[in-house]
Amino acid sequence: MGRHSKPDPEDSVDDLSDGHAAEQQHWEDISGSYDYPGVDQPDDGPLSSEGHYSAVGGYSASGSEDYPDIPPRPDWEPTGAEPIAAAPPPLFRFGHRGPGDWQAGHRSADGRRGVSIGVIVALVAVVVMVAGVILWRFFGDALSNRSHTAAARCVGGKDTVAVIADPSIADQVKESADSYNASAGPVGDRCVAVAVTSAGSDAVINGFIGKWPTELGGQPGLWIPSSSISAARLTGAAGSQAISDSRSLVISPVLLAVRPELQQALANQNWAALPGLQTNPNSLSGLDLPAWGSLRLAMPSSGNGDAAYLAGEAVAAASAPAGAPATAGIGAVRTLMGARPKLADDSLTAAMDTLLKPGDVATAPVHAVVTTEQQLFQRGQSLSDAENTLGSWLPPGPAAVADYPTVLLSGAWLSQEQTSAASAFARYLHKPEQLAKLARAGFRVSDVKPPSSPVTSFPALPSTLSVGDDSMRATLADTMVTASAGVAATIMLDQSMPNDEGGNSRLSNVVAALENRIKAMPPSSVVGLWTFDGREGRTEVPAGPLADPVNGQPRPAALTAALGKQYSSGGGAVSFTTLRLIYQEMLANYRVGQANSVLVITAGPHTDQTLDGPGLQDFIRKSADPAKPIAVNIIDFGADPDRATWEAVAQLSGGSYQNLETSASPDLATAVNIFLS
């Protein structure tokens, strides 16, 4: 039968059903033959203006070209002999069919075929869905393109984030900053460049404590000091909130740059030996270097990173008694710092120039310089005969290491874009290609072969030195800062030491050690002398700077004369009451900017019953002023029954206690040198 003719009598119901099914399949074929975006496509995930697309301009000029056109519904004309009515009947009929309608309920009298409402609803839903997806993606792409384009054009403006690097690594950081600025994309809608300034850690820390110095530029978002000591000092000065992240970039061990003649002589020494070698007038004679006198070790702070601070940590840790914290070795650090050579300035350049100056090596003003392996490498590269003029000594034991952390800072002076740019640059510095550049400059980088050098073989390192938490590291560093101004010490000497030791009385041996130390102390040091016996304590020379005369006589000479007239007595000691008098006097005349201390040298026992051990401890506990710290250091001989009291007093005051069996040993000179530093 024709497509739109009435059913013939022989047509069955099944035939009619088959025809309707075929027509419905025809529509499904049409709608399914086009790939509509968003219908059967995999989910692309949420649209984003950042990070989802690789670059601006990755699209065609018109976003609609990314999607196929939706074809119009195909036209079809009824076939057959029946004419089309002028006004077609409604597409949908409702209610009951009359007897003239389709037989078997499939055809109406007018010959028009009805379409299932479910098919129409589904088709409309698909069209609406496709249109919605197209519009959604079109506007999303447009906004994304607009955001990327705006960012690429820096519509929010241009900005700079400051980076401060230690002078020892600043040149390499500036080189990395240039390549970073050439390739970095915008942060949000702003272009943020990195600007690197070279500055030492003291300048940066002082800037955070007080007014930020204009010569350093803007306050930084990233700081690269020589070591984590500087980060610890900043935390102590400005609070932990000042640092948001800190991690090591490269490392370089601290060592001594020396003349080759001294290198082999130091082979069996260690960090703890340096204070004694520095202060003993003939120390190097014992190392088969006659006519060299004492070691003249320079410890420059300018242009030398944190090498001096790191060496101080190593000396303190090695000098502290077994089981004691590194702070117990602070005296040794002060000794080393106090006896360093006096140069034109405190720079690494001045120290190295003096070390390498032609002439008699034995009598040279400088025998060795504390620095880092990287600085040694750089100096060696500039010498024509480096192998014969410059050597190095890396002390045995745990290595003091400059770890050059990338310290991300946090503060109100930074915008979000500056903070993000500083973080991005820090990550950039940690990339392998940037680390390789640093390795070529002499820094140690994990799994990167170091360059060849005539002055160092870049030997394998033992374990890294650890001296405690940030607070302890800051304390040790601050001690070295104050040590440069010398000490303010009062010597409290016990006259009742008649024991014969090494052919001299114990008192004579002590006097000799004190005289040698006073001769080596810097003129800025403040020194006074008290003595005591079984009856009383008395002032021999009032405390004052060594540069100031006493009764028309140079103070060192006055002190030496007073010591020379001492004689041994055998009757008791009023040590506790004498210390009380001295402590009160030092509180009243506290020397700001210097390490104030009392050095008690005694053998006991205390015999004055007006003040016992617990009473002395209670006095120290109540009198101590945190704003005026006064350390009580004790050198105690033999089996002194007052030992427990002296140990407690030293601990309460922040000082140290050392017991010696005899005065006839180098340990006495070492102890005196440590405590008067």
UniProtKB/Swiss-Prot annotation:
Q: Alphabetically list the UniProt keywords.
A: Cell membrane, Membrane, Transmembrane, Transmembrane helix
Q: Organism source for this protein?
A: Mycobacterium tuberculosis (strain ATCC 25618 / H37Rv)
Stretches the record annotates as Disordered: 1-87
Is Transmembrane helix found in the keyword set?
yes
Transmembrane region(s): 115-135, 192-212, 313-333, 474-494
Entry superkingdom = Bacteria
Q: Is Cell membrane among this UniProt entry's keywords?
A: yes
- Record's bilayer topology term: Multi-pass membrane protein
Q: Where is the signal peptide?
A: none
> According to its record, what are the GO cellular component terms?
extracellular region; peptidoglycan-based cell wall; plasma membrane
Lineage at the top is: Bacteria, Bacillati, Actinomycetota, Actinomycetes, Mycobacteriales
This protein's name: Uncharacterized protein Rv1836c
Task: State the compartments where it is located.
Answer: Cell membrane
- Which stretches are tagged as biased composition: Low complexity? 51-64
Extra remark: Was identified as a high-confidence drug target.
Q: What are the Basic and acidic residues biased-composition ranges? A: 17-29
